[in-house]
């Protein structure tokens, strides 16, 4: 019984570490793409993981100055979800940064359409999440 419990615990830890690694890989890849986008749009963007955000937000884009933004992802929330949430969240927040706009209006939607081209590796689940965001705004 003790052995079964030990094996079960190790299996759970292994699965958890693999899932966390997938989240980290998507985050690192997405953060690098965000830097390319920032360069193309002539803005500065810092992408960070944080342990919590106000009002249970999953992510936020904050203005730090003229042409300077910080994107924060609630990593506890993000890791509790599928790793398919990482890329759409980065696209959503980058659209706010490149438009210097905190609303979900046509300007933001147009930015989403432009930004998805930077993420050719998106799978259909991620693309569906982005489409749902756009549909809500339109």
Each language-model region and where it sits:
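Sec-dependent N-terminal signal peptides
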Residues: 4-14
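Walker B catalytic acidic pair
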Residues: 93
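Short pre-active-site segment immediately N-terminal to the catalytic Zn-binding motif
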Residues: 71-89, 100
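Short alpha-helical functional segments enriched in proximate histidine and acidic residues
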Residues: 97
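Sec/Tat signal peptide C-region and signal peptidase I cleavage site
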Residues: 15-20
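Catalytic zinc-binding patch centered on the HExxH motif and its immediate surroundings
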Residues: 49-70
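Zn2+-dependent metallopeptidase catalytic core
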Residues: 23-44
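Post-HExxH zinc-binding segment in Zn-dependent metallohydrolases
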Residues: 41, 101-138
């Amino acid at each position: 019984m003790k052995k079964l419990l030990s094996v079960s615990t190790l299996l759970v830890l292994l699965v958890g570490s693999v899932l966390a690694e997938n989240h980290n890989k998507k985050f690192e890849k997405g953060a690098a793409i965000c830097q390319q986008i920032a360069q193309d749009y002539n803005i500065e963007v810092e992408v960070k993981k944080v342990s919590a955000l106000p009002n249970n937000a999953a992510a936020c884009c904050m203005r730090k100055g003229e042409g300077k933004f910080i994107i924060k992802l609630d990593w506890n929330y993000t890791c509790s979800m599928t790793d398919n949430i990482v890329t759409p969240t980065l696209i959503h927040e980058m659209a706010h940064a490149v438009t210097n706009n905190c609303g979900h209006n046509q300007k933001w939607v147009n930015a989403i359409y432009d930004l998805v081209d930077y993420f050719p590796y998106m799978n259909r689940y991620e693309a569906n999440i982005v489409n749902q965001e756009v549909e809500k705004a339109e």
